[in-house]
């Protein structure tokens, strides 16, 4: 079944929080890794917005996760 935009946003939000907490980073620290503000990171984690593709790829590389994992397509 194809996921709709809201489902993808929810899964991505959950994965961003999970990855950040696994690495024991604050929202401010994560933002600095990708040249974004704490406010931007908080917005992603609240599901209000999504990181742009380049930023998401940078986070995935830092966290050693695949893009499929970030989008909730693999465990």
Where are these regions (language model features)?
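A short, Lys/Arg-rich alpha-helix, primarily the initiator
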Residues: 1-22
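DNA major-groove recognition helix of helix-turn-helix/homeodomain DNA-binding modules
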Residues: 54-69
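The alpha-helix within a helix-turn-helix
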Residues: 20, 31, 60
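Acidic active-site catalytic centers that drive phospho-/nucleotidyl reactions
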Residues: 20, 45, 68
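Short alpha-helical DNA-recognition segment
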Residues: 24-46
């Amino acid at each position: 079944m194809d996921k709709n935009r809201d489902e993808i946003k929810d899964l991505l939000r959950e994965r961003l929080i999970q990855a950040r907490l696994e690495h024991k980073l604050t929202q401010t620290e994560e933002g600095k890794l990708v040249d974004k503000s704490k406010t931007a990171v908080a917005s992603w984690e609240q599901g209000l917005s999504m990181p742009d593709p380049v930023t998401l790829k940078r986070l995935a590389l830092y966290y050693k996760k695949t893009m499929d994992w970030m989008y909730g397509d693999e465990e």
